[in-house]
Amino acid sequence: IRKSKISESNYFYIPSLSITTIIYKGIIMPEDIGPYYKDLQEIDLVTRLALVHQRFSTNTMPTWELAQPFRHMCQNGEINTLRGNVSRMRVREEIMKSDVFGPQIDKLFPIILPGKSDSASMDMVVELLTHTGRSLPEIMMMMIPEAWEKHKTMSKERKAFYEYNGCIMEPWDGPASVPFTDGDYIGALLDRNGLRPSRYTVTKSGKLIMSSEIGVVDVAPEDVKEHGRLEPGKMFLVDMN
């Protein structure tokens, strides 16, 4: 569709074709998301997880396809290395091969569409890597690694993981907290410098809430089991299975 001559095909965007997640998005106020999508008003609609993103765009004009969350992630922060990341992905396209697509793999290019935000660009690469057989947590660790090079107490196996994957993918670096989910995993990863807040609450009633600050979701004090925060370079992960 993108490469067709259909009128206004540049505005065509599929939020998701996933069988495990549904994405609701829009350029609207947070309190309007429920009334806008009628199925969110149905009492029979239930979910075991939710990933919510609320903010105003700062480095791109607000458009529907750039509204977060994206297909696999959202972001609070910015990727300072974006120009280099995009350039390297374009270079990689020259050597990419696929048993599935064969000689038609060039129809996937460019992997990162021009004119997209840092968050949208990162999500496109995450989507590509999910089709290589890697798990979503592994992909996030590849793209946002810990400060591992001079870490004296890190295990050799963990350092080897980062060293190996560093040959495949350079870091997407910057002050950012990046929540992600594929329906089976849900979690968040904080940049190696810890420059964005990420705090979590575990309740006695069996809920787990993570957000940029405490208090986004009301929790009775007597229901709080544990409070905590995500440390620099660390991942917060829940296996829903």
Question: Where on the chain are the PLM-derived regions?
Answer:
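Conserved short alpha-helical segments that host acidic/polar catalytic motifs at enzyme active sites
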Residues: I1-N241
